[in-house]
Swiss-Prot record:
NCBIfam families: PRK13695.1. Has nucleotide phosphatase activity towards ATP, GTP, CTP, TTP and UTP. May hydrolyze nucleoside diphosphates with lower efficiency. Belongs to the THEP1 NTPase family. ATP binds at residues 15-22, 101-108. The keyword Ribonucleoprotein does not apply. HAMAP family: NTPase_1. Keywords: ATP-binding, Hydrolase, Nucleotide-binding. The lineage of its organism: Archaea, Thermoproteota, Thermoprotei, Thermoproteales, Thermoproteaceae. This is Nucleoside-triphosphatase THEP1. It comes from Pyrobaculum arsenaticum (strain DSM 13514 / JCM 11321 / PZ6).
Length: 172
């Protein structure tokens, strides 16, 4: 497939919950924004009184924040979270941005509840010269099929992986 040949760099960050995957991606995006056009989206936890109650998706280019999922019952759901399909348009628009570095946080079950996410992701990866994604540990094979090199993040190797990503993206 020709689309696999396009991107110069495709890095996927995976790991267990709470090791700093989103933090790493946000810090790289902040550094990259000094010299590159950055687009895409990040998924951020929403907490209430210290307890995680859900997730919001944030479009990096516009700053638009949209509820993605909350604890509750209903469909579609992922675990204890109900996914709000209204957030799908934010994700889709973020993946259609034109930029030098595409950020995707995350490639995971909630995002795949959005109709068209797979094809939007594939198109965005093809059209972006550099891609940095958070990849849920259950989706690493899929990401590898899109040409991603998967780096496994832990609390112990966070700084090493951060430096490796910065170097690979030409930001050092």
């Amino acid at each position: 497939m020709m689309w696999r040949e396009r991107a110069e760099v495709r890095i996927g960050i995976s790991g267990m919950p709470g090791v700093g995957k989103t933090t790493l991606v946000l810090k790289v995006a902040e550094l990259a924004a000094k010299k590159l056009r950055v687009c895409g989206f990040v998924t951020q936890e929403v907490r209430e009184r210290g307890v995680r109650i859900g997730f919001d998706v944030v479009d990096i280019a516009s700053g638009r924040r949209t509820p993605l999922a909350r604890v509750g019952t209903g469909e579609p759901s992922v675990g204890k979270y109900v996914v709000f399909l209204g957030a799908c348009s934010t994700i889709s628009e973020a993946l259609r941005g034109t930029c030098d570095l595409l950020i995707v946080d995350e490639i995971g079950a909630m995002e795949f509840k959005c109709p068209g996410f797979g094809s939007d992701l594939e198109r965005a990866v093809y059209n972006s010269p550099k891609v940095l994604a958070v990849v849920h540990r259950n989706y690493t094979n899929l990401a590898e099929s899109l040409g991603f090199e998967i780096l496994w993040l832990t609390r112990d190797n966070w700084s090493t992986i951060y430096n490796q990503v910065v170097h690979r993206l030409g930001l050092a």
